[in-house]
């Protein structure tokens, strides 16, 4: 996103060697190959589509801000041995993939996480006004950045499509209504006035 690029340049954290989709697939294939002996259920032997499935899974985990440690913790709460194994193997694949990527590349799927880490350490946007337009909802990864911006910027504005005559439970407005509730809660927790 433009905000990521701006903050990265402002703070000297620009990414030079960004991984592309083709290279992501190669690195995932290498990660699965490296783990062949350790994987019981998610083995890549004879399963060419596993690379695509695991790339999508890693992407979904990052967007949802679910860490491999959280997957491992969840596996301890599960009685089903197959699910427990899948959670642990997914965590192992994710860790191995990230380790291989980090040796040579910057993963753009981590940009929002990197941005939020910068915002938490250094309030570089404290005198800025940020306007969000055209969003009805946010991923968890995006929400972490949004919360930092609500807390740190001099003003943050959001345009959401809501029907003032309903409670927002209608399907058409449900996502925007849920987003509004989340944003309102963030502002309340961080002592930010809502106008």
Where are these regions (language model features)?
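A generic structural motif
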Residues: 1, 158-162, 194-195
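Conserved P-loop NTPase-based nucleic-acid remodeling module centered on helicase motor cores
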Residues: 1-73, 81
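Coupling/hinge elements of helicase-like and P-loop NTPase modules
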Residues: 39-52, 181-195
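Residues at alpha-helix termini
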Residues: 35, 61, 103-104, 190
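Conserved helicase NTPase motor core
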Residues: 20-24, 28, 70-189
